[in-house]
Amino acid sequence: MHEKLLRLCFFAERCVILEVNKIRQPPGCSKGVNEIMKEYAFGIDLGGTTAKIGLFTTAGALLEKWEVPTDTSNAGEHILENLAAAIMGKMQEKAIPAEQVEGVGIGVPGPVLDSSVVPIVCANLGGWGQRNVAAQLSGLLDGLKVLVGNDANVAALGEIWMGAAKGCRSAVMVTLGTGVGG
């Protein structure tokens, strides 16, 4: 039996969503419950000028961060392709097999439905929008799990989880970039 526990692990300037799978041993096995956790996750903060990408351990430690330009030409047609190429390139460079990647979290400038769909046009991304970002990016990443959230919301969650708002009962965050969010 599989139990899935979703932990939101978003950071300011970097975001990641991790899922921990717990697998119960078959009857008669004395090992009890084992926790299986993959080693790596990627986070993307998609902005109108650049996309900031981070490679993390599933415990939340930042291993490496880098940026790629956001190509807003042709209504942002190549944004997801460029992000996938950056992640796949890093996996190849670091010899990280897909089986060790828990998934990818991406913060986008605009509202998001169901952790997957950007429902309106994002002006900061050249008119990009009205697409299932999670499904499209997952397809470009050979099936890696992708979850999507509003960039300001996930940045605030990151600050609550591991940043300046850790331990606070309430917090407010305003983000500045190509646009303003909060």
Where do the model's predicted regions map?
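Short glycine-rich, Thr/Ser-proximal phosphate-binding strand/loop in the N-terminal lobe
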Residues: 40-81, 85, 118-120
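Short glycine-aspartate micro-motif
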Residues: 41-45, 101-105, 171-175
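Short, positively charged and aromatic/hydrophobic N-terminal segments
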Residues: 16-20, 25, 33
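Glycine-rich phosphate-binding loop of actin/hexokinase-like ATP-binding domains
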Residues: 166-182
